[in-house]
């Protein structure tokens, strides 16, 4: 009798499952993350493109570390190469991508756009000398350069930021005409400001991107290829996988650790979610909840020190303090954010009666200790930045070298594990193979880092245009006066209005660009109302980030729902509930800047703020989940939320009132449990 041809082995089934998961991940990334909607190259064309991208990454590293040229030369050169790399990688539409094909119009746009920026770099001194008296040819070059940059932004960033930039450019043009300028003079002034000065395309956002962000994107690409993501997931599994609802807690911890490296909420949701979301569903969590947990935790990765995300470097520049101080100030808010998510997933697990992963299925501690060398580049970066031994750029460069060394060691150890006998010959062969693998990894990391830099650089350039328009028109002053008059003496209303602005403008806009817009418009409003500088910028930074999980345009939540096969809107609502701490914490440090280590008079002051904040977040999360020790009815849930919010209001009296409410609810739950136990007997 012949064997059944349809019979599949467990290994074959696992392979098919992994292929299906990989296909789902690719599909979701293409749908929600524009960075992955790139051209398809193969053969010699792929090699040429890879070499160009790797060389561009090396150019960025070398120019950042060693160049002494003035910004008007360095930054246009950088943007010229971004234009070249952008059109080589991003097609006009993701629906019409032909392998190994670059349309003639893309070649035209690529060459002309890059030429505009290179012309500026080569004639920088002339442009500075001419100032607003630039000639018609210069106006034409600036117009073409901006229009081609706008098209590249449409391809790799998206439409929302273009709508904002377009409206502001039209307003700036109208503003010039309203003061009596001719059509040409208005165009000349705007193009000069936006294209030929450091108040536009090559403004602070692009300068910070060129100086710091690109290096850290490249560092993140190297770090990911050392296998650190798998290490973080294994570590989170060992740490929390055994507890009630363990897979969800694993998702929170691993996404926090991986998210601070990747800097992309959507990308991190998809990559770590492809592992954690199926685990959560298998444990018993609803698909909407599983996708929401991953989205909320991955989004929080951008506020997780030490790397945080690209916007943190911009914040350091805008506030005028070292990046290390920004990272330190972000510690307590980040702890509160992830504690809030952790509490929510724990209460949900208890409510559903979910178990954890059996301990015998968890990674062994000895294996984790063996692989802990993978985090050495990250440890080195933290030490260099915190000690001030090196500049940020040099710290990133040294950390990249450390990541290369760790990658080589990792490849070598993996090759050795594959050999049964360790003779001189087998060790030499393993070393030779590891060197080859490491060289390929370095090449791939440089290419990935350069690709990642395109989207961020273009978003920063558009943010520079937006900031330039706001400066030219004086729109910031108008907004400040309008909000201050509307809020009056009710500063809390000012915070609410600012929060709404940040979330609306942040929908579909990359975090870097969103923060730049908020730093130019909304942060000055809060400062004018009397809030501290650092607290104001952290406030807009936080609400710019949570736009990724706030419906109706919650890209990270929708990416999580695609992996979980759940309803996108329900997933977004669940993600917002889980990340409730992100909506509360900014109000806490707005009224208590001590949480950001500002104006601290004693350690006990910080301890009191943190304890009351933790209790408040716990109570609010419990009220939203409807569970502490047992299910709660709606009146008790509302009371728990009120008690939690009362704890979050500054003041001893409010703290005591909130504490009494929360303690009373817990006491009631304890008594109800005892009564239920007696009745069961």
Residue ranges and their predicted role:
Residues 1-132, 139-143:
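Conserved, well-structured core domains of diverse proteins
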Residues 2, 6-47, 53, 328-452, ...:
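Long, contiguous bundles of hydrophobic transmembrane helices that form the permeation core
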Residues 38, 63-68, 89-100, 126-127, ...:
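Membrane-water interface regions at transmembrane-helix termini and the short interhelical loops
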Residues 67-68, 124-132, 188, 192, ...:
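Membrane-interface helix termini and inter-helical loops of multi-pass transporters
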Residues 136-140, 199-212, 238-252, 283-289, ...:
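Membrane-interfacial loop-to-helix junctions in multi-pass transporters
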Residues 147, 151, 155-156, 164-181, ...:
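Core transmembrane alpha-helical segments of multi-pass membrane transporters/permeases
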Residues 220-224, 255-264, 296-302, 463-467, ...:
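Transmembrane alpha-helix interface/packing and boundary motifs in multi-pass membrane proteins
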Residues 233-301, 307, 311-314, 320, ...:
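Hydrophobic transmembrane alpha-helices that form the pore/transport pathway of multi-pass ion
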């Amino acid at each position: 009798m012949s064997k059944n041809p349809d019979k599949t082995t467990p290994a074959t089934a696992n392979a098919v499952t992994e292929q299906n998961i990989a296909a789902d991940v690719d599909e979701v990334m293409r749908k929600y993350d524009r960075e992955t909607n790139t051209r398809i190259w193969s053969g010699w064309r792929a090699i040429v493109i890879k070499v160009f991208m790797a060389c561009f990454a090396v150019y960025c590293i070398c120019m950042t570390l060693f160049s002494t040229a003035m910004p008007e030369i360095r930054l246009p050169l950088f943007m010229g190469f971004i234009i070249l790399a952008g059109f080589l990688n991003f097609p006009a539409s993701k629906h019409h991508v032909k392998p190994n094909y670059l349309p003639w119009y893309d070649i035209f746009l690529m060459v002309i756009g890059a030429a505009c920026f290179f012309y500026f770099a080569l004639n920088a001194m002339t442009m500075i000398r001419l100032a607003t008296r630039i000639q018609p040819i210069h106006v034409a070059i600036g117009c073409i350069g901006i229009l081609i940059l706008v098209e590249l932004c449409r391809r790799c960033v998206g439409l929302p930021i273009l709508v904002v930039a377009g409206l502001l450019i039209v307003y700036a043009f109208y503003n010039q005409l309203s003061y009596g300028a001719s059509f040409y003079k208005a165009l000349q002034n705007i193009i000069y400001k936006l294209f030929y000065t450091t108040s536009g395309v090559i403004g602070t956002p692009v300068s910070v991107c060129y100086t710091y962000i690109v290096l850290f994107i490249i560092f993140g690409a190297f770090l990911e290829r050392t296998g650190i993501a798998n290490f973080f997931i294994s570590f989170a599994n060992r740490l929390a996988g055994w507890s009630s609802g363990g897979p969800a807690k694993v998702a929170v911890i691993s996404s926090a650790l991986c998210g601070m490296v990747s800097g992309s909420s959507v990308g991190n949701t998809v990559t770590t979610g492809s592992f954690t979301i199926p685990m959560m569903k298998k444990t018993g969590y609803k698909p909407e909840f599983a996708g929401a947990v991953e989205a909320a935790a991955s989004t929080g990765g951008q506020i997780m020190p030490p790397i945080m995300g690209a916007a943190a470097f911009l914040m350091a520049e805008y506030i005028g303090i070292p990046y290390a101080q920004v990272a330190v100030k972000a510690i307590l808010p980040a702890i509160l954010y992830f504690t809030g998510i952790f509490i929510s997933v724990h209460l949900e697990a208890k409510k559903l009666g979910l178990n954890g992963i059996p301990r015998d299925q968890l990674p062994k501690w000895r294996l984790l200790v063996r692989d802990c060398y993978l985090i050495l580049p990250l440890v080195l970066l933290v030490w260099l930045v915190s000690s001030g031994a090196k500049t940020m750029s040099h710290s990133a460069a040294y950390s990249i070298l450390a990541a290369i060394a760790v990658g080589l060691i990792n490849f070598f150890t993996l090759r050795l594990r594959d050999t049964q006998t360790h003779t001189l010959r087998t060790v030499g062969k393993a070393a030779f193979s590891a060197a080859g693998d490491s060289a390929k990894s370095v090449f791939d990391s440089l290419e990935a880092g350069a690709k990642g830099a395109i989207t961020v650089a273009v978003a920063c350039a558009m943010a520079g245009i937006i900031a330039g328009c706001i400066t030219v028109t004086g729109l910031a002053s108008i907004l400040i006066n309008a909000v201050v008059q509307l809020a009056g003496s009710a500063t809390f209303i000012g915070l609410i209005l600012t929060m709404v602005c940040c979330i609306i403008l942040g929908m579909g806009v990359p975090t870097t660009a969103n923060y730049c817009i908020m730093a130019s418009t909304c942060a000055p409003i809060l400062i004018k109302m009397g809030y501290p500088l650092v607290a104001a910028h952290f406030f807009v930074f936080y609400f710019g980030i949570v736009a990724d999980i706030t419906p109706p345009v919650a890209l990270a939540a929708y990416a999580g729902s695609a992996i979980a096969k759940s309803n996108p809107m329900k997933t977004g609502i669940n993600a917002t509930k889980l990340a409730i701490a992100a909506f509360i914490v900014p109000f806490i440090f707005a009224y208590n800047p001590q949480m950001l280590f500002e104006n601290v008079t004693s350690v006990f002051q910080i301890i009191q703020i943190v304890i009351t904040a933790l209790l408040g977040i716990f109570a609010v999360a419990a009220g939203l989940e409807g569970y502490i020790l047992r299910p709660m009815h709606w009146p008790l849930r509302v009371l728990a939320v009120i008690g939690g919010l009362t704890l979050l209001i500054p003041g001893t009296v409010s703290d005591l009132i909130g504490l009494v409410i929360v303690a009373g609810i817990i006491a009631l739950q304890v008594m109800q449990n005892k009564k239920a136990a007696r009745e069961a007997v």
